[in-house]
């Protein structure tokens, strides 16, 4: 009986381990993108009017001039978020108002980095095509991601923004 119970526990632990290693669908989508492309985001079920605000590595707040900066930064401050080795996506739904409409998704650093600082984009990105405008926060309806390469390290860079069609 004990070996059977031990085997059952091991199966449960292995299943839990497999679930925790599972990437979010959004992360899987970004990881599959090829450099030198601008693409729309997949439908993640976010309602119209939802804003997406990526935070890059070690970034703990949005720039003060960014749309929604006050609301998002108050949310991050209340959570005592300090940034770190991972990047995150702040999802701000139009309703409900306040903190209840904000969600923070965390993504482990992988084979790409997310940038949203204009100075870093200008310094590190190999190229930003004409017609693509990097944005600190972007609506799901207009959101596009640019995939480019870092000039010195050749890592993929993901930049959120809008594109002229």
Where are these regions (language model features)?
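Surface-exposed acidic loop/strand-edge motifs in secreted or periplasmic proteins
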Residues: 57-89
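N-terminal export/targeting and maturation segments
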Residues: 19-70
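C-terminal partner/receptor-binding element of secreted or periplasmic proteins
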Residues: 114-165
